[in-house]
């Protein structure tokens, strides 16, 4: 999946040029991740802390179920949704409650990402434009950050 990070960074650069804004490259800091079963993992807490550090975003809890939205401050558009749900809702076998991240994604990436482990058609969102990612360590923290950055850029206007 090294190619994924390169493709996302290229897309972020293209969108930044369109909007005349600069996006700094992603910092790859291994100290900001938890480790589970020997794998680096970004969980809900680390994701929300990273979003606050990177964008100054405080999570919004519009429902009383613990699910939260990350919004742009200026236009209030969502760029990410973090929720707990039964893995069956993602089309998986099993009955576990899992943390899931929804992000807006570029059409060029979304189809190929859904063929990779940890990626799913977006739950409760437009499946053509949004993607669900399980926060269970299957998807690397760097890929998650890249996709949140892309989603942030795609929802800017």
Model-derived features with residue positions:
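Charged/polar low-complexity intrinsically disordered segments
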Residues: 6, 17-18, 27-28
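Compositionally biased low-complexity segments enriched in histidine and/or tyrosine
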Residues: 11-17
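Charge-dense, helix-prone N-terminal extensions
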Residues: 28-157
């Amino acid at each position: 999946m090294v190619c994924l990070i390169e493709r996302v960074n290229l897309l972020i650069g293209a969108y930044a040029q369109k909007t005349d804004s600069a996006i700094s490259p992603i910092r790859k800091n291994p100290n900001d991740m938890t480790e589970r079963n020997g794998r680096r993992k970004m969980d809900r807490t680390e994701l929300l802390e990273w979003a606050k550090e990177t964008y100054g975003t405080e999570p919004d809890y519009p429902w009383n179920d613990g699910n939260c939205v990350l919004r742009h401050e200026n236009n209030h558009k969502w760029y990410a949704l973090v929720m707990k749900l039964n893995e069956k809702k993602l089309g998986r076998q099993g009955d576990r409650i899992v943390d899931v991240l929804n992000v807006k994604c570029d059409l060029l990436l979304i189809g190929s990402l859904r063929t990779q482990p940890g990626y799913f058609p977006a739950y409760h969102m437009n499946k053509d434009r949004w993607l669900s990612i399980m926060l269970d360590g299957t998807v690397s923290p760097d890929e998650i950050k890249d996709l949140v950055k892309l989603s942030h850029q795609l929802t800017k206007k």
